[in-house]
């Protein structure tokens, strides 16, 4: 259920609230809900419109673009972002070897370059300004700050063991996110000293592992055990046949979406192939020294329900020098119905079948190394394991703070086609010698936390507004992008619209879809805003702020922000550093350094 406003809040807002009457509207998209305030004024279309977009990722940039397109010369858009640099997950969430996906930045740069747009980087909603600060300064505020949290596995060891992190943070690490690399950002994990996420991931990927931690799975036959006994006794014949990856540590990735595939691909591909991409230099250095040679992708349901897209799956399955093993990808009659209903899933299954048919060329030896009379192949291994759920993350025998193995429960699917659910069977298997476990089971938006209280000077008795949040769905409740609030039955009940407040992107619909989906989403939200404007239902900015937006407030609070000119200086410096290294850019990984570069000459 959506959050319910307190009686005190309603008492302040209800005094002037009036449900709007009039002729019926053509569709629910155009029909305004009941309003929580009488702030709306009749605004002639020729008057300037001041808008604030909170978040400069794809959703925010598309929303700004649509506002500029619709309102033309009368629009002014201020864009706020907690990061010093714009473009959100296009910068920090797209894999470095997918440069074509990042080309959308060219369009977003055009939006930023528009003289009607101002950018305020390093200005966080809830930390530096509040919703209560913004709404009286603009005709409308569009929330586009996305999903900054993660869904969890809810298993023992997930929150306590070093080496267990979210895929979101891992992606941020190889993309140079300051939260992973900055010298001003530290983490503390289960008794470990404070260290950056980069240091933690480096320790996971490059630490020495003992052969006693060799992986063991449910198909660990007596013959396999016998071979290991011969290996331990030094049988040269069996050493000759031993796979190169037998002693290598494993990375386990929970989830079968495209983010999981990105993480697996970065871990498995030859790191030298990434040198000419915009991957963070520190992350590249770690990957080049990585001891991880095996990656296990774990999915709780079957191949017919997996979320990955065919193109990304084919790319992963066909990496050079990577053996592929697939477990429990058989399909039932009910699975066939799921496949029939989804062309992408059919194509994904075909990609798996084609890769299995090709097999692994055990005779192919790349980068042969002669050492003590044995041959070792410089190959890696990908295993895709369907119908498994994590049961526990277990510490190493020699280090109670560090991840050592993963226990999985085998699943079976129940239910009709289209709603098949995974149910545990009680049977388990263990993957040992696990250096890194990434959870990639979905992003999640968080409720806005306002860490300070600023007494309103323009309306001393006004209720301090926050952003409603539907914790069950992980979104800001809305109707076609109009932010709504559930009102207690004693106060009239129903869904009421919060005046002048709109939402777009993952914060609006949940964390799903591709970058292009945000354009459609932004068009819907801006369409609702325009419809409200046509009926005189936008806010009128308080005249005491002189149509200057949030800039004077940030200046008064002595907040060091990054303008679009400052961003251009950061961009130029990153490109300069990249050119020296033969790559598109070398991202700056410290907020403090970003601010220094942005303010040079400014």
What is each of the regions a protein language model found here?
Residues 50-73, 260-267:
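N-terminal Rossmann-like FAD-binding beta1-loop-alpha1 element of flavoenzymes
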Residues 46-57, 247-257:
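Beta1/beta-strand and adjacent pyrophosphate-binding region of the FAD-binding site
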């Amino acid at each position: 259920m959506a959050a319910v406003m307190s009686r005190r809040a309603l008492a302040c807002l209800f005094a002037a609230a009036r449900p709007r009457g009039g002729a019926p509207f053509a569709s629910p998209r155009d029909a305004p809900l009941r309003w929580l305030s009488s702030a709306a004024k009749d605004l002639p279309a020729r008057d300037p419109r001041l808008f604030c977009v909170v978040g400069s990722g794809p959703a925010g940039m598309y929303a700004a673009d649509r506002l500029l397109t619709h309102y033309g010369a009368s629009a002014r858009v201020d864009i706020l972002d907690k990061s010093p640099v714009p473009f959100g997950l296009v910068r920090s969430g797209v894999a470095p070897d997918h440069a074509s996906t990042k080309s959308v930045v060219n369009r977003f740069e055009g939006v930023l370059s528009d003289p009607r747009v101002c950018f305020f980087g390093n200005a966080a909603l809830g930390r530096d300004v509040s919703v209560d600060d913004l709404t009286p300064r603009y005709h409308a505020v569009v929330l586009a700050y996305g999903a900054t949290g993660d869904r969890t596995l809810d298993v023992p060891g997930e929150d306590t063991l070093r080496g267990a992190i979210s895929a979101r943070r891992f992606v941020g690490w190889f993309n140079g996110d300051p939260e992973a690399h900055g010298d001003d950002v530290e983490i503390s994990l289960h008794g470990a000293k404070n260290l950056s996420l980069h240091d933690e991931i480096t320790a996971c990927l490059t630490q020495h592992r003992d052969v006693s931690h060799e992986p063991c799975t449910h198909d660990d036959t007596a013959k396999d055990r016998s071979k290991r006994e011969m290996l331990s006794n030094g049988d040269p014949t069996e050493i000759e046949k031993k796979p190169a990856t037998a002693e290598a540590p494993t990375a386990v990735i929970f989830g079968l979406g495209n983010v999981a595939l990105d993480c697996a691909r970065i871990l498995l591909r030859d790191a030298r192939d990434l040198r000419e991409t915009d991957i963070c230099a520190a992350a590249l250095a770690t990957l080049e020294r990585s001891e991880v040679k095996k990656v296990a992708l774990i999915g709780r349901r079957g191949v017919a329900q997996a979320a990955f897209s065919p193109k990304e799956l084919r790319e992963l399955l066909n990496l050079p020098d990577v053996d592929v093993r697939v477990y429990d990808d058989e399909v039932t009659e009910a699975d066939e119905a799921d496949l029939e209903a989804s062309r992408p899933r059919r194509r994904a299954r075909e990609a798996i079948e084609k890769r299995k048919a090709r097999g692994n060329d055990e005779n192919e030896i790349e980068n042969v190394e002669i050492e003590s009379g044995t041959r070792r192949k410089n190959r890696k291994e990908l295993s895709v394991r369907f119908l498994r759920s994590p049961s526990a993350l277990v510490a190493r025998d020699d280090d109670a703070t560090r991840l050592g193995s993963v226990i999985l429960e085998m699943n079976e699917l129940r239910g009709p086609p289209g709603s098949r659910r995974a149910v545990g069977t009680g049977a388990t298997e263990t993957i040992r010698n696990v250096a890194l476990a990434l959870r990639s089971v979905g992003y999640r938006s968080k409720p806005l936390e306002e860490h300070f209280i600023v007494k309103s000077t323009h309306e001393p008795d006004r209720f301090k507004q926050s952003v409603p949040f539907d914790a069950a769905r992980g979104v800001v409740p809305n109707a076609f992008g109009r932010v709504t609030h559930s009102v207690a039955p004693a106060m009239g009940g129903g869904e009421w619209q919060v005046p002048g407040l709109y939402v777009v992107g993952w914060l609006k619909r949940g964390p799903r879809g591709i970058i292009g989906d945000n354009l459609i989403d932004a068009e819907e939200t801006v369409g609702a805003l325009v419809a409200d404007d046509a009926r005189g239902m936008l806010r009128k900015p308080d005249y005491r702020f002189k149509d200057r937006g949030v800039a004077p407030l940030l200046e008064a609070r002595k907040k060091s922000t990054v303008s679009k000119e400052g961003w251009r200086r950061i961009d130029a410096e990153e490109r300069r550093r990249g050119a020296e290294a033969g790559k598109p850019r070398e991202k700056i990984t410290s907020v403090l350094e970003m601010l220094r570069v942005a303010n040079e000459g400014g």
